[in-house]
A protein has these predicted regions:
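Arginine/glycine-rich "motif VI" loop of SF2 helicases in the C-terminal RecA-like domain
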Residues: 120-131
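Domain-level recognition of nuclease-like catalytic cores that cleave nucleotide substrates
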Residues: 5-6, 11, 15, 19-29, ...
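A glycine-rich, hydrophobic loop/mini-helix early in the fold
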Residues: 73-92
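Short acidic, S/G/P-rich loop/turn micro-motifs used as interaction or catalytic elements
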Residues: 76, 103-107, 143-146
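Mg2+/Mn2+-dependent nuclease catalytic core
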Residues: 104-117, 121
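Conserved catalytic cores of phosphodiester-cleaving nucleases, focusing on short active-site segments
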Residues: 87-89, 93-104
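Short amphipathic alpha-helical segments, especially helix-boundary/capping motifs
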Residues: 60-62, 92-96, 128
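Acidic-basic catalytic patches of nuclease active cores, encompassing PD-(D/E)XK
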Residues: 2-79
């Protein structure tokens, strides 16, 4: 399967993207038009005021960072009342959907609502929706959810676990 300039490869019924294909897929979505950033710049723009935030997401090999998008900012006007997900990063052809948020028991419902919004939003987003992807909740101030709590079990059912940091490529 080929795009206009880039290539899409099927892997376990999910597509992986090259750098051009990711950028084209992003620019092809009306509310994301103009939101593509090289490397982790979409996250870095948001983290400028918070030095600790910058170290939350790192890449094993920065040459494999195909770009990033601040989904929250790009979709704010179209979905002002929605609980929007924060970012997507394309690393070595796979999409990492990242939510930077305090990881407290009281925040679980809010983050699950954001995940539900994201999955619903992706349904009609062609290439982004079909790509190989994973979802990550990165704790902005440590993880404060008891492992055996009801909230931890709710997260496990949805396949989401708060992490202190994300190392792409591990």
């Amino acid at each position: 399967m080929k795009s206009l300039r880039g290539h899409i490869q099927k892997t376990n019924s999910k597509e992986t993207m090259d750098k051009d294909t990711f950028k084209e897929a992003v620019e092809g979505i009306e509310e994301l038009h103009g939101a593509y950033r090289k490397g982790l710049q979409a996250l870095n723009d948001d983290c400028k005021a918070n030095d600790d935030c910058k170290a939350k997401v790192e890449a094993t090999d920065t040459r494999l960072l195909y770009g990033s998008v601040d989904i929250d900012m790009a979709t704010r006007d179209k979905y002002p009342q929605s609980s929007r997900w924060d970012y997507v990063v394309c690393y070595h052809g796979a999409l990492y959907f990242i939510e930077l948020h305090p990881a407290r028991t009281s925040k679980v419902k809010e983050v699950l609502n954001k995940l539900e919004w994201l999955k619903s939003w992706l349904k009609d987003k062609d290439r982004l929706g079909q790509a190989k992807k994973s979802y990550h909740w990165i704790a902005t101030d440590g993880v404060h959810i008891q492992p055996e709590s009801r909230e931890a079990k709710q997260l496990a059912i949805k396949g989401l676990k708060p992490e202190k940091r994300l190392k792409l490529g591990n």
